[in-house]
Amino acid sequence: MNSVPILEQGISSLSFLLQQTLVKKQEIIPLSQEIENLNHYFTIQGIRYAGMFDVKYKLENSSLSYEIPRFALQPLAENAIIHGTANANMPITIFIESHFSDNNSLKIVIRDNGCGFNSNETKQTSKKCGSGIGVKNVDQRIKLHYGTSYGLSVESHMGEGTICTLTLPRILYEEEQ
């Protein structure tokens, strides 16, 4: 197997993400751009975790034009990969979905069928490992920008996987002038 094309893809994706991080200073972007960022992240992690995860999308097409804080999905995807595959003896699938809810909000769901965790043990694990900072940061950024009616909820069950649901207001993205 020739690894040059794989490395080229990885370098290209890393370059793209570095540009998004260092050059572009937009705090809010359209969901379509966030998904593009996420795809580049998955390309990089796919090299590192070869064959350990697969990604499936079910995105409501019209939702791609709505706004989301930049890099809100990447920490959730990172947790799905790192923690979902930790004790897995087979590849996991990460599902990314978007839909509009009845209360005029946009729901973005990242769920995996990985090992999951016991929510009672989460606080102890976070203290020991220093984990959970990215997830807390995503929730705090959403609440700070949109108010406390919006944010992130996480549900997990041992042996079944984890579901992260972002709730955002239904606001069409408008390019900053």
Show which residues each predicted segment covers.
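Short, charged/polar, Gly/Pro-enriched secondary-structure boundary elements
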Residues: I171-E176
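Two-component histidine phosphotransfer core
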Residues: M1-E155, G161-T167
